[in-house]
C-alpha cells in the first residue's frame, strides 16, 4: 500500500489537483479489488468506523501504513455452558500505525484489530469451522477494532471521540482464507490491477492537465509578445510628440483628465475596446506611470463599488458584466477557503454576511512594475510588481447549522451558530514570492491583454479574518483562515481584469 500510495503521489505531483479529495484513495480502491472476503479491510469503512468519523478521512489520503505487531495465540478457556468442559480458539492481534495527509494537515491514527475463531473442543470442531466454496477455503472470524490514538494536526486529539464512536462493537465476518492467506502472492496481481485500472488513468489525467496548462501559458506568452510588438508600433507616434508629454502625464492624474486627453485623440475610453487601445499606447509611453494610474483606479473602483457609487448599476454592468466585481466579492463568495470547506459550509448551514463598512488604504505612493525591455514579465517572475494596499471589510451577520449538523456540533469544537461582526482584511501587493510562482498550478505573473480586451493581472493576496467570539475564532484559526496566504489549489493567487476596474471609475466619474 505504501508503494502504491507513493506512485499515486508521484502521479499527482506531475500537476497537483486543486481538491485533494479527487486523489484516488489507495486503501478503498485496493481492498475493493481484493473483494469483501479479504481480511483485514484496512480503510475506515472496512474497519466499521462510524460514518461521522470515517467522513473525516474523505479529505485525506494515506501517506503511510505499518504493521507494528502481529500475535497469533491458541487460547484455552472453560466452556460457559457445560461445567468442566474446555474449549479452544485462535486469537489474532494486529497493531497498525497510519499517517493520513491532505490540505496541509495530517491525521495520526494508531489502531488494533483483535480477532478470534469460533470455539472448538477438538480437531473435528476445528475442521467444521472451515468450509469450501468453489476453490476458496472460508472461515468465520469475530473481531473488533480499537483506536489507540487519533490526532489531527499534531494537537487536536480525537482519540476519545473515536473510541466512544466504536464502543464495544463486535463484528463477525466470513473470511476468504484462500485470498487472505493461502494465495497471498495474488496481492501482487491485485497491485497490477490497481495500476491498470486506477493509477494509469489518474497519471494520464494529470499529464494531460499539465500539458494543457503549459500550452495555455505558451499561448499567453505568444499573445503577450504579439501585443507588445503591436503596442510599440503605435507608441512611436506618441514618443515623437514631445509637446504632448505634459498633457500625457496629466492624463494619468485623474479619471476626468484621462478621458479628456484621449477624447482629443478620438478615443472614447468609456468604451472597453477603445480603453484597451489607449492603455496599450499609454503603457508603451510610460509603463510605470500608467501602472501607478491603474493601481489607483483599482483601489478607487473597489471603494466606489461598495460605497460612493454602489447604486450605479449601469456602470457596474458595463465594467464588470453580470458576474460583478472580480475582487473582492462580498459575502461568503468573497472569502477564500478550500473547496471542501466551502462545500461543507454551504450545504450544512445558513450563512448571512452583510457589508457594514469597507475601507481601502494605500501603502505605497508610487507603484512600479519590474518590466524588462524586450522580455516583459516572464510567467515565472517572482516579485513582478511594487505596490501595496489593504482592503478592510467589516461584516455583520452570522450562520446557523442545519438540524442534525447543529446537534452533531455539540460533540465537537465547531460552534453551531454565530452572529456578530466579522473583520476581513485583504493585503494586496505585487511581491509574489518564489515559492508561489514555483507551484505547478500558478497562473503566471500576468500583466497582459487577452483577445477580450481584458488586462489580466495576477494578485498576491493575504487574507486575515477576526471575530470577537473565541469559539468561532478558534475554528477560523484551525482552518488557517485567520491568516491565509493565497498560494495554490482553491486558494491560489487570483487573476483579475485590471482594466475593468479603471473602466468602472471612468464610467462613474
From Swiss-Prot:
Identification of the protein by name: Uncharacterized protein MPN_508
List the InterPro entries hit by this protein, alphabetically.
DUF237, DUF240
Top-rank lineage group of the source organism: Bacteria
Give the family this protein belongs to, as stated in its UniProt record.
Belongs to the MG032/MG096/MG288 family.
The record's Pfam families line, in alphabetical order, gives:
DUF237 (PF03072), DUF240 (PF03086)
Amino acid at each position: 500500500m505504501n508503494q502504491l500510495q507513493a506512485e499515486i503521489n508521484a502521479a499527482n505531483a506531475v500537476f497537483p489537483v486543486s481538491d485533494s479529495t479527487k486523489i484516488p484513495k489507495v486503501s478503498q480502491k485496493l481492498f475493493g479489488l481484493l473483494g469483501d472476503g479479504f481480511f483485514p479491510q484496512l480503510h475506515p469503512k472496512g474497519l466499521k468506523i462510524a460514518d461521522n468519523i470515517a467522513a473525516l478521512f474523505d479529505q485525506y489520503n494515506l501517506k503511510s501504513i505499518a504493521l507494528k505487531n502481529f500475535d497469533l495465540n491458541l487460547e484455552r478457556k472453560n466452556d460457559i455452558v457445560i461445567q468442566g468442559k474446555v474449549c479452544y480458539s485462535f486469537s489474532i492481534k494486529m497493531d497498525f500505525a497510519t499517517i493520513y495527509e491532505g490540505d496541509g494537515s495530517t491525521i495520526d491514527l494508531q489502531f488494533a484489530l483483535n480477532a478470534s475463531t469460533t470455539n472448538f473442543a477438538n480437531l473435528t470442531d476445528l475442521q467444521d469451522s472451515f468450509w469450501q466454496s468453489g476453490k476458496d477455503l472460508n472461515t468465520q472470524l469475530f473481531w473488533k477494532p480499537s483506536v489507540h490514538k487519533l490526532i489531527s494536526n499534531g494537537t487536536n486529539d480525537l482519540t476519545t471521540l473515536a473510541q466512544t464512536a466504536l464502543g464495544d462493537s463486535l463484528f463477525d465476518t466470513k473470511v476468504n482464507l484462500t485470498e487472505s492467506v493461502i494465495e497471498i502472492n495474488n496481492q501482487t496481481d491485485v497491485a497490477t490491477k490497481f495500476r491498470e485500472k486506477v493509477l494509469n488513468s489518474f497519471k494520464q489525467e494529470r499529464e494531460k492537465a499539465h500539458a494543457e496548462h503549459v500550452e495555455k501559458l505558451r499561448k499567453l506568452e505568444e499573445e503577450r509578445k504579439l501585443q507588445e510588438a503591436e503596442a510599440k508600433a503605435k507608441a512611436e507616434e506618441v514618443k515623437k510628440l514631445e509637446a504632448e508629454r505634459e498633457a500625457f502625464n496629466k492624463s494619468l492624474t485623474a479619471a476626468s483628465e484621462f478621458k479628456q486627453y484621449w477624447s482629443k485623440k478620438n478615443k472614447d475610453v468609456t468604451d472597453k475596446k477603445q480603453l484597451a487601445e489607449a492603455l496599450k499606447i499609454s503603457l508603451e509611453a510610460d509603463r510605470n506611470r500608467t501602472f501607478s494610474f491603474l493601481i489607483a483606479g483599482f483601489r478607487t473602483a473597489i471603494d466606489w463599488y461598495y460605497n460612493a457609487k454602489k447604486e450605479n448599476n449601469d456602470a457596474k454592468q458595463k465594467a464588470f458584466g453580470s458576474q460583478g466585481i472580480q475582487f473582492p466579492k462580498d459575502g461568503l463568495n468573497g472569502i477564500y477557503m478550500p473547496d471542501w470547506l466551502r462545500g461543507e459550509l454551504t450545504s450544512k448551514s445558513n450563512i448571512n454576511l452583510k457589508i457594514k463598512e469597507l475601507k481601502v488604504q494605500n501603502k505605497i505612493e508610487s507603484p512600479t512594475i519590474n518590466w524588462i525591455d524586450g522580455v516583459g514579465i516572464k510567467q515565472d517572475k517572482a516579485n513582478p510588481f511594487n505596490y501595496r494596499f489593504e482592503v478592510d471589510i467589516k461584516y455583520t451577520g452570522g450562520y446557523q447549522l442545519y438540524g442534525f449538523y447543529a446537534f452533531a456540533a455539540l460533540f465537537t469544537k465547531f460552534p453551531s451558530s454565530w452572529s456578530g461582526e466579522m473583520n476581513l482584511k485583504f493585503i494586496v501587493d505585487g511581491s509574489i514570492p518564489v515559492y508561489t510562482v514555483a507551484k505547478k498550478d500558478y497562473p503566471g505573473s500576468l500583466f497582459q491583454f487577452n483577445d477580450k480586451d481584458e488586462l489580466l493581472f495576477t494578485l498576491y493576496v493575504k487574507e486575515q479574518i477576526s471575530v470577537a467570539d473565541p469559539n468561532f475564532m478558534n475554528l477560523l484559526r484551525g482552518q488557517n483562515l485567520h491568516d491565509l496566504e493565497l498560494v495554490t489549489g482553491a486558494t491560489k493567487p487570483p487573476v483579475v481584469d485590471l482594466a475593468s476596474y479603471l473602466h468602472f471609475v471612468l464610467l462613474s466619474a
